[in-house]
Amino acid sequence: MKSRTGLSILNRILVLTLLFGLVLLGSCEKAPDETPGKGKAVRPARATWTTGFFLEAIYSRALEDLGYTVEDAKNLANPIFYQSLVNDDVDFWANGWFPLHNTQLPKNFDEKAIIAGTIVKAGAIQGYLVDKASVEKYGIKSLDDFKRDEVKKAFDSNGDGKADLVACPPGWGCEKVITHHLKVYDMEAHINPIKAGYTASMADALARYNAKEPVFFYTWTPNWTVNRLAPDKDVMWINVPEINPTEGQKGFEKAMVLKGVAGAVTDPIKMGFPANDISVVANKEFLKKNPAAKRLFEVMSIPLEDIAKQNNRMFAGENSQEEIEQHVTEWIALNKDKWESWLAEARKTAK
């Protein structure tokens, strides 16, 4: 007997059986593994500047949510981290600054490691700031003004005849650039760079500002400093005399002159530092063995303003590892959909 479609009952049974089998196969298709990192350890590192601790914590938390066992982060100076990365002693960090760190990469970096993701695109600016009252009183526009005796005297806190600048500790990328600036702009006899611990030095500068004394410091964004000493309200960005790049800055000269910077003494302003990408940097072999982590690094990013807010909380005293982890938990709760979408992307890659 044939049906109205012309198929025999036997053929209809065969077709239905085939369709049922296809449904079963579809339902048995492997779902993305919720924990592709299960049984695998990750060895993170983090920078020696405390404003980078939040990024390490949030990226490590994401890896934990993928099932990885994340070891305690090693605090490493930039050159030591990059050498450790190519030596396969650590797997990643979320504290890459480029092009600032270009000169600190080992010769075999491209063979062994890679910039694996961008956390903040061209959002990290750096430069020199002076309290607004002094800018107006002395007509300060650039580093060159610190060659004037009355300016040096106002910023000389130890009586050595030089203006004191809160600079960067040895091993930081900015320390090399500041040293370069003082040399090429003939400022070594006029400015004393303070290279002690940055947070403590800036706390001293903040205390001087609150006592209505002049302050002169280097900083970067995101950073708690610009929350406590706000550009245009409390302090002003000043120029370098001319664009004179370090070896690692060559090719980025145009990016060292910025327009529309809030609190700049001029517009445009010669910052002396190009705007940097904050990046995840990882070992290539680690990424090859861990496609879920690789994809996670590619899709994750953190807004600059969120990093700055967290940094401000750290400076206010919430700076223990437990408190930083709590900041991560709170951030995830406020960005749950975005967080889950990143994890879903990573899980799909590992399927």
What residue ranges belong to the model's regions?
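Short, well-ordered beta-strand elements
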Residues: P36-T51, Y68-K74, K162-V166, F297
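C-terminal motif of bacterial Sec signal peptides marking the signal peptidase cleavage site
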Residues: L24-S27
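Short helix-initiation/N-cap motifs at beta->coil->alpha
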Residues: W49-T50, Y68-Q83, P193-D204, P222-N223
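A bilobed periplasmic-binding-protein/Venus flytrap-type ligand-binding module shared by bacterial periplasmic
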Residues: Q126-E136, D277-K289, R313
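A conserved helix-loop-strand patch within extracytoplasmic ligand-binding domains
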Residues: A113-A167
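C-terminal functional modules
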Residues: F273, F286-L287, K294-L296, M300-K351
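Flexible, solvent-exposed loop/hinge segments that line or gate ligand/substrate-binding clefts
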Residues: K183-D186, I194-A308
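Pocket-flanking alpha-helical
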Residues: E56, L76-K112, D204, W224-A230
